[in-house]
């Protein structure tokens, strides 16, 4: 499965557009992780605990996006975008793209 942020692929032809696919991953926040992140913000520097959560969430959301596209018979997803959102109780990562059948 080919995933790309572009909407045109050099050297590949789109045989059929199969529709928009979306995926979402939600993680609950963690009191200890939040406390450690707050300390890090006061001291300064990167908050590795949250970076790891976002890294994992992005991997998971792309895996889910790929699975949903495969169910449509796609072998590629064009125009992939990933968005993150954080509230006091959760972290939301969404992905969207256009499922396609490539030649």
Curated annotation (Swiss-Prot):
Q: Which PANTHER family match?
A: UPF0145 PROTEIN YBJQ
Tell me the Pfam families matching this sequence. YbjQ_1 (PF01906)
* Name of the protein described by the UniProt record: UPF0145 protein CYB_1351
**Family stated for the protein in its record:** Belongs to the UPF0145 family.
């Amino acid at each position: 499965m080919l995933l790309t942020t572009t909407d045109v692929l050099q050297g590949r032809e789109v045989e059929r557009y199969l529709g928009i696919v979306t995926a979402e991953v939600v993680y609950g926040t963690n009191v200890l992780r939040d406390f450690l992140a707050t300390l890090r913000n006061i001291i300064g520097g990167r908050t590795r605990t949250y970076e790891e959560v976002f890294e994992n969430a992005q991997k998971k959301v792309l895996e889910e996006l790929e699975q949903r596209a495969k169910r449509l018979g796609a072998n590629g997803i064009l125009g992939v975008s990933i968005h993150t959102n954080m509230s006091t109780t959760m972290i939301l990562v969404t992905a969207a793209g256009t499922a396609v059948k490539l030649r």
